[in-house]
């Protein structure tokens, strides 16, 4: 049995992924927020739990394990840090202590590693931690403790190695450390998602950086290419799970024209932009908001622009619309992965008003073939052809905490405690289980080989 410590465990995404690897046991999990610890214990009752500010506790208090997983404070590294600090709360205030100290610092990783001499360490953070000024000093500190390392930049929608990925585009930084002299984990294998090449058909895609600087996000700094030499680096798009797979289609929301309070002006503009672009032709394709921080926001995309490996299925003429005030947020197909989930609920669901959808007895239907990798949940209705849908006749609602939980790829039975706001926050802070699963699997395989 390979044992693992999960520091800054939050709601338990990293632990949930780790225990999906055969032979791996999470021995202890720790976080400073009691509600997060309670949530973790609710779902992982066989794990030991410690509620503590990790920057203020002695590492010797914790048992030694084979692997350390750590997800230190990411707020000060994120490009979203520049956002206004006061954000209207959709439900109720977050506890002050959780607001001020969501996680401990990156320096707690070498502090714990110095005491416990873990066989391997995995550190998760936002992509921009690689631009943190003490980043190189932090790596040197781990090197001085006897570790070699490899840094992986991975999007959770590409974590296909041991199962389905997350239905969400979520770029993250992962630093993997192993003891000098131990076997190097095969991290390249887990970064080859399935794709479809126009020439060679199904392939295991290879990552290709656009420049010599290997730091960044999918599409912005790297893409995937066909591995066959004869293709001469033909770009391919990996398969993904659509956002439609996490939406409860039995709840269509309220007709916009019937809402007692109008939606915000920016939200209405985004809805109208999506309708004008995608619902003005013969087919009203489903759309979803792709809400990415920073200036390089992802463009709106129709489901008909999907990669050949993703066959449209289980789709709905719908929009997910961001409701927060920042510019540059655009609608995108629900056949695309869900946008990166933050700690706030900022995404709404818009569906066209179709009479047959008002009843509860409609059977599941799709517009084309079903997805090869997954089917959408709930009841579904095929798209219709016709003229542009009026904005007043469309239905709109916010995504529920349960839908956001599923967008993070937590199991359906996973229980996240607290208020709706607490649940959204814990989901947004979590590690997606598929990414943790694949990374822990690679590390565990290297340790078994060494043994």
Describe each PLM feature range.
Residues 35-39, 105, 403:
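Conserved short alpha-helix immediately C-terminal to the canonical SAM/SAH-binding motif I
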Residues 91-102:
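A short acidic, glycine-rich active-site loop
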């Amino acid at each position: 049995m390979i044992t693992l410590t999960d520091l800054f465990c939050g709601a338990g995404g990293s632990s949930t992924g780790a225990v999906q690897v055969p032979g791996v046991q999470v021995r202890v999990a720790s976080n400073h927020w009691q509600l997060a610890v309670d949530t973790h214990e609710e779902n992982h009752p066989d794990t030991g739990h410690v509620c503590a500010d990790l920057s203020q506790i002695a590492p010797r208090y914790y048992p030694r394990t084979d692997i350390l997983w750590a997800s230190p404070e990411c707020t000060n590294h994120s490009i979203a840090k520049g956002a206004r600090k006061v954000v209207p709360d959709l439900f109720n205030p977050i506890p002050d202590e959780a607001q001020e100290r969501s996680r401990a610092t990156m320096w707690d990783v070498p502090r714990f590693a110095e005491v416990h001499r873990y066989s391997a360490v995995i550190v998760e953070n936002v992509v921009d931690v690689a631009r943190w000024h003490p980043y190189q000093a932090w790596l040197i500190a781990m090197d001085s403790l006897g570790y070699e390392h490899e840094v992986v930049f991975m999007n959770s929608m590409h974590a296909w190695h041991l199962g389905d990925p997350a239905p969400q585009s979520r770029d993250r930084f992962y630093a993997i450390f192993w003891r000098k002299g131990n076997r190097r984990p095969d991290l390249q294998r887990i970064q080859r998602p399935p794709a479809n090449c126009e020439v060679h058909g199904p392939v295991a895609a290879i990552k290709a950086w656009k420049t010599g600087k290997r730091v960044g996000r999918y599409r912005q700094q790297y893409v995937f290419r066909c591995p066959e030499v004869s293709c001469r680096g033909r770009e391919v798009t990996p398969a993904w799970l659509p956002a439609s797979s996490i939406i409860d289609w039995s709840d269509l929301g309220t007709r916009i024209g019937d809402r007692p309070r109008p939606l915000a002006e920016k939200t209405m503009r985004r809805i109208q932009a999506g309708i004008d672009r995608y619902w003005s032709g013969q087919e009203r394709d489903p759309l979803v908001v792709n809400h990415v921080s920073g200036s390089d926001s992802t463009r709106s995309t129709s489901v008909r622009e999907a990669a050949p490996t993703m066959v449209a299925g289980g789709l709905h003429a719908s929009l997910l619309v961001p409701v927060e005030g920042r510019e540059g947020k655009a609608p995108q197909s629900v056949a695309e992965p869900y946008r990166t989930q933050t700690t706030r609920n900022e995404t709404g669901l818009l569906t066209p008003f179709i009479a047959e959808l008002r009843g509860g007895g409609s059977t599941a239907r799709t517009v084309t073939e079903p997805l090869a990798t997954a089917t959408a949940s709930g009841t579904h209705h095929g798209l219709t052809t016709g003229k542009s849908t009026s904005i007043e006749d469309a239905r709109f609602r916010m995504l529920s905490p349960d839908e956001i939980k599923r967008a993070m790829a937590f199991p359906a039975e996973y229980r996240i405690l607290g208020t709706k706001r607490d649940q959204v926050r814990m989901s947004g802070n979590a590690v997606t289980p598929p990414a943790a699963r694949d990374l822990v699997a690679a590390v565990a395989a290297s340790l078994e080989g060494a043994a």
